[in-house]
Regions:
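General marker for long, soluble alpha-helical cores
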Residues: 1-184
């Protein structure tokens, strides 16, 4: 189901949409902040869409490289599919478990595409914006909470990169930017 996935792009999205991400903040959400995270709120993808998810295509990690991570933190992944999760490592994966991973990129993000991300924030959202965090909403943010949305704090993306932001779309990106994404 990953036929339209562009390995050289950021998470399948064109490089032009991800100019200001910082490699130093790769993990984004700290483990202790994920307590209220629900699998049905991951990037707006419902569980019914996760059935077609191919763990072997996840950011270049092979399915045999997944294992001890809590299923509640990974949504569609069972504990048996996430063997070597290391919360202290980059993105939760130990470097020696990243054989199928592109050494010149971090989670699919090229090092040269990562600059203005706020490492002290959660997934790009400053703590004051997290007060409105709703684990049952798309990506954790309900439309009614988007009033406090700070485009410059989201993954460090500048306003220019946030033009196409659509809170009702998958992962916040408009359908016209989801061309390479196949949820089914």
């Amino acid at each position: 189901h990953m036929a339209g996935f562009d390995a050289t792009a950021v998470g399948g999205f064109g490089k032009e949409h991800f100019q200001n991400f910082d490699v130093g903040a790769m993990q984004g959400f700290k483990a202790d902040h994920l307590g209220n995270f629900t699998s049905d709120a991951i990037g707006g993808i419902g569980m019914d869409h996760m059935k077609a998810f191919d763990p072997s295509a996840m950011a270049g990690f092979g399915k045999d490289q997944f294992g001890a991570m809590a299923a509640s933190m990974m949504g569609a992944f069972d504990t048996e599919k996430i063997m070597n999760f290391d919360p202290t490592a980059m993105g939760g994966f130990d470097m020696e478990k990243m054989a199928a991973f592109d050494p010149n990129a971090v989670g699919g993000f090229g090092k040269d595409h990562m600059a203005a991300f706020d490492p002290s924030a959660m997934g790009g959202f400053n703590m004051e914006h997290m007060a409105a965090f709703d684990p049952n909403a798309m990506g954790g943010f309900d439309k009614s909470h988007m009033a406090g949305f700070d485009a410059t704090a989201v993954g460090g993306f500048s306003m220019d990169h946030m033009k196409a932001f659509d809170p009702s779309a998958v992962g916040g990106f408009g359908k016209d930017h989801m061309a390479a994404f196949d949820p089914a």
